[in-house]
Amino acid sequence: MRAAYLFLLFLPAGLLAQGQYDLDPLPPFPDHVQYTHYSDQIDNPDYYDYQEVTPRPSEEQFQFQSQQQVQQEVIPAPTPEPGNAELEPTEPGPLDCREEQYPCTRLYSIHRPCKQCLNEVCFYSLRRVYVINKEICVRTVCAHEELLRADLCRDKFSKCGVMASSGLCQSVAASCARSCGSC
């Protein structure tokens, strides 16, 4: 029984060695028929092959980072009328808001068709490429929300507030920056 299994296992290799199989190359796929819906993605400069990406020198990286700094647009608060001075709120309200722009760049990968030829036989395979989606997003930041967030942070990480008020901020600056944004 084992001999029969071994015979059936090695039968294709033996027939291939004797030339029983026809190994004529298949005709190549026509370029204009296959993967036409990818043509706009292949020529798009926002698509990068992971093998082509090289690290930038530090000076060039610094210039790139300085170009991506957050832009803020401040919306002025309405001015109170002189006759209604007693109705002025002491805490910021919902009108003390501003729109803040920030870069929300995302990196994700897709599979791009890649033509490969070997001994006049061409075929397409899918190659992973990375796409950089560069966008500027806008969020509304209100003063009362920032105060609530600061209060929660101060309560949760009390040592940051204590160190900041006592002038010893530098000793815990790293942990406070991770938790609250800054000391």
Swiss-Prot record:
Signal peptide (from-to): 1-17
Protein's cellular compartments: Secreted, Extracellular space, Extracellular matrix
Residue ranges with Low complexity bias: 60-74
Keywords: Disulfide bond, Extracellular matrix, Glycoprotein, Pyrrolidone carboxylic acid, Secreted, Signal, Sulfation
Primary location group: secreted
Positions of post-translational Pyrrolidone carboxylic acid modification: 18
Ranges for domain ShKT: 153-183
Sulfotyrosine: residues carrying this PTM: 47-48, 50
GO cellular component: collagen-containing extracellular matrix; extracellular region; microfibril
A Pfam family assignment: MAGP
Protein name, entry field: Microfibrillar-associated protein 2
Upper classification of the organism: Eukaryota, Metazoa, Chordata, Craniata, Vertebrata
